[in-house]
Amino acid sequence: MKAELLLPLLGLQALLGAGTYFQTVTGFGLGMIVMGVTSGLGLAPVATVAAVVSLVTLANSACALPGKLQHIDWRAVAAAAIGILPSVVVGVLVLEYLSSSAATLLQLLLGAVILYGGLSAALKPAPLAQRSGDGTFFVSGVFGGLLSGMFGVSGPPLIFQFYRQPMKPVEIRCALILVFTVTSTVRTLFSAWQGQLDAAVCVQAAIAVPVVVIATLLGRRFPPPFSPATTRRVAFGVLIGIGASLMLPAISAWVL
């Protein structure tokens, strides 16, 4: 294989491995890490990478969740999933309806809200005194679905919601992995229905599965020795990064 083809493939596999490990130990990050870096470096077409990420997320959950299902707050996950599924479609339709300037302004506002929430939570990483009601998980799912449909980023509202709960880290991780598995399943089925699961996607996903499985097992076996407070700070730090990444392109578009 020629170097100009091999290097992007190896780079993508390395990113998938790193993102999978991060998601296994925190419950999120695979899609955000891989999509963010690959789009910035141009390692592969965005549509192809998105389809590959959805497929390997299923492999990640298949290895990360066995033996840990008893830790999942099923009511919270169900409420979030119910909110996510229809709002993804709404997000896509809203983005198609809005003008480019309105969409840019909305992206700026969403980035500012996520950045503020991440900063506020990072400064006070202690969890809430008691679990939030199921309705708040539904609302976080709705906003997560809207973000996914409009900007391809569903994580921030869900990360903020689950990491503020008085849950053990393992409970938060497993719940988020399951929620994102539901989202990835829907995306994969929709991609298949649209005929987007072509040979390139299937080959790259097949190559990535062993990498994802190994990274998942490493995450389960050798998680970083972080305290719950540190883990929450890491999660909220990622939210800060996501908020900034949404704001900067929007600001650039307005300035230029």
From Swiss-Prot:
Per the record, membrane topology reads:
Multi-pass membrane protein
One Pfam family this sequence matches: TauE
InterPro entries recorded for this chain? TM_pro_TauE-like, TSUP
Q: Where would you find this protein in the cell?
A: Cell inner membrane
Q: Which family does it belong to?
A: Belongs to the 4-toluene sulfonate uptake permease (TSUP) (TC 2.A.102) family.
Organism encoding this protein = Cupriavidus necator (strain ATCC 17699 / DSM 428 / KCTC 22496 / NCIMB 10442 / H16 / Stanier 337) (Ralstonia eutropha)
**The keyword Transport appears for this protein:** yes
Is Kinase found in the keyword set? Answer: no
Q: Where are the transmembrane segments?
A: 5-25, 33-53, 76-96, 103-123, 142-162, 172-190, 199-219, 236-256
Task: Identify the GO cellular component terms for this protein.
Answer: plasma membrane
The protein's superkingdom reads: Bacteria
PANTHER family attached to this UniProt entry: MEMBRANE TRANSPORTER PROTEIN (PTHR30269:SF37), TRANSMEMBRANE PROTEIN YFCA (PTHR30269)
Q: Which UniProt keywords apply?
A: Cell inner membrane, Cell membrane, Membrane, Transmembrane, Transmembrane helix, Transport
The role this protein plays is:
Could be a sulfite/organosulfonate exporter with a wide substrate range, including 3-sulfolactate and 3-sulfopyruvate.
Its recorded name reads Probable sulfite/organosulfonate exporter TauE
The induction comment states: Induced by the C2 sulfonates taurine, isethionate and sulfoacetate.
